[in-house]
């Protein structure tokens, strides 16, 4: 599968925060058109050195991915090696002044096997097709999202919920590899010319709704102007806000990769087809058992 990209665009804004704790890779507003992967991390506020955590993860992933041949398939095992290296980098940075540093992660990579999307926390990934709308939206690892899924809250009640900043997964330096939160990983071959992939920290989501995002991306404006408008809407956010917009120029598909992706259930080892938001995806998800204390006390970006 040969996926060719248009020029990607990014913004990286401090909002109404005193410090910038978001990081991105590559750290430029208009990267080289040969760039095949994109990362946005949001350092966990209220904890030690969130900006160090987000930058460390971005730099580690950038280093690991520099050795990848994107003309080959980038497997879930390959991604797990990249993620492990990022955790190792966090461990290496750990000291008495930043023992609790942590960050979210969003990652998108285009390769011969399709597109791999991965996230930890509440930074988000969208795949939007102008003719159909949102094909995929990552499912936030957050307290309120869990409450919505369990029927405790309605989506409307969740919007301004007082625990809206509590996340249930995050990347941090831990004492054991067994305690590392793993990512939700999606692989899709349903990629078409004109598709948009949008990845962002949650500060962007404070300023723009899904409907507004779709409206902007489906407009007749050029990609640079679309991203400029999203940045303008986000610049007065109460939070740091960072995003990447990547559009698909052309896709050449061979018969093998055009087949539906499948998911293997790690518990039953049964192979079954799944469909998420109108596209066939492969999901490999390993959920960290987060303690009650960890869930309730990790408040993102709470400085007071």
Predicted segments, located by residue:
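PP2C/PPM-type serine/threonine phosphatase catalytic domain
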Residues: 1-304
